[in-house]
Amino acid sequence: FSFTAWDLGAVRDSVAGVAEFTTQDGARWRMVMDRVQTRDVPHHPRFGGVIMGLYYHGVTGVHTPLVPTINSAVALWSFAHLYRNDVLVTDNAAVHVMLLSHTRREGDFALECWDCSRNKIDEVQLQILPGTGEPKFNAPGGFLFVNWEHSVGAQPAS
């Protein structure tokens, strides 16, 4: 998974990126992000689509308290084109990506902490949901959630 995100304010944020992965059923997925989600929904601000350096979830009062408190180097909300086995599934997938502090325990991937905000930032989470009014994906639960550990981020050269 490789992406670039620009946090340029509430109306100028931008994203570009591609993720490719294979699910347990052998399906090959490709997600291509090319535009941000800017519209906030209740209790879930999107900060113009991209935000850098945000403590949220858990006890922060930002987004859901039902998951650990994390430190996110970058969080973004975008729309994307999604392909399954090279066949277009949707041009309007709703995507949320975070490069965040480590939350998972080695070996079984269970949550390792409730306040994970001081852990090393080395985890990428990718959540892909059907667009509004679209059918569920042909995947367990109807959506995709991919987690990469031991990930790194880099600041682009100015």
Indicate where each model-derived feature is located.
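Predominantly extracellular/secreted and cell-surface proteins with exposed
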Residues: F1-D91
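Residues in flexible loops and secondary-structure boundaries
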Residues: R39-H44, R105-G107, A154
